[in-house]
Amino acid sequence: AKLLAAFDAIAAQTPLEQQAHYAGLFEMNKRYTLYMSYYKMTDSRERGTILAKLKMMYEMFGLTTVNSELADFLPLLLEFLAYGHFEGDARQQDIKLAFQVIEDGTYTLLQNAAADLDDPYFQLLQVVRATLRTCVETGVVAS
């Protein structure tokens, strides 16, 4: 229900309003970035290590990024998890890094957004976070 309500709220906007809303939240505001390791590590060397590990994980599973997004960009992480074929793969354990980065990043993002949690984008993030947590707790991996 929460997922559909968020989609409906976003769909009620014109495409131009959707773009302005998204850009205002995530592209023009450091407080609400979708780069998941930024919150914990900002621009430290440790963040560089995480970005390199994520990139290696993508490559290990055959994903080559064609855009200039950093490896910790939430939509990229979610796309990797959604379309990856991990079931029965001995390297399945390696995708835990993606879950950890998303868990850490969305936790801080939603803490920063406490005053704006009624925004449909943050409602979507809450659903994503809860779904991924359920996957981790039950041992279910995208396939």
Where are these regions (language model features)?
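Charged, alpha-helix-forming regions
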Residues: 1-143
